[in-house]
Regions:
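Short beta-strand/loop segment at the start of cytosolic alpha/beta domains
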Residues: 1-16
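Short acidic-hydrophobic, aromatic-tinged amphipathic segments that line or gate anion-handling sites
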Residues: 107-109
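Amphipathic alpha-helical interaction surfaces in cytosolic regulatory modules
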Residues: 21-105
C-alpha cells in the first residue's frame, strides 16, 4: 500500500511517502501534490514560483518509477531554486537519481 502525508511547518511543506511508487500510484500522487502546492501558493499558475520550501521524504519508499522522477522535477520547478529537496533515500533510489543526473539539481540526500 502507498501513502502520502503532508505537514506544514513554518515556511516548509513536507511530503512523506511510503511504499512502491510505481506508475499507477504516481498518478494520484501527482494530483495530490499539485493540489497541495496550488492551495499553498494560492494560485494554479505553474509559472508562478512558490516562496516556500518543499521536502520529499522517501524513508519508507522501496521503489520509484520514472513517473515519480518526473513529479520530482515538476515540483522542483514550482518553487524557487534551492527550495526543493529529497531526503532519506534508499541507496538504490539515490543511485537512480544520480544516474539520471538529477541528484544535485534535486538536492537528493
Amino acid at each position: 500500500m502507498v501513502s502520502i502525508e503532508y505537514k506544514e511547518a513554518d515556511n516548509n511543506l513536507n511530503f512523506t511517502f511510503n511504499g512502491h511508487l510505481d506508475t499507477n500510484t504516481s498518478t494520484w500522487i501527482n494530483e495530490s501534490i499539485i493540489k497541495e502546492l496550488n492551495n499553498r501558493k494560492g494560485s494554479d499558475n505553474p509559472e508562478e514560483k512558490a516562496d516556500f520550501k518543499v521536502t520529499f521524504d522517501l524513508l519508507d519508499v522501496s521503489y520509484i518509477s520514472s513517473y515519480f522522477i518526473r513529479i520530482c522535477i515538476l515540483t522542483a520547478k514550482q518553487v524557487k531554486p534551492g527550495n526543493f529537496r529529497i531526503i532519506n533515500c534508499d541507496p538504490m533510489i539515490k543511485k537512480t537519481f544520480k544516474i539520471a543526473g538529477l541528484d544535485e539539481s534535486l538536492n537528493v540526500s
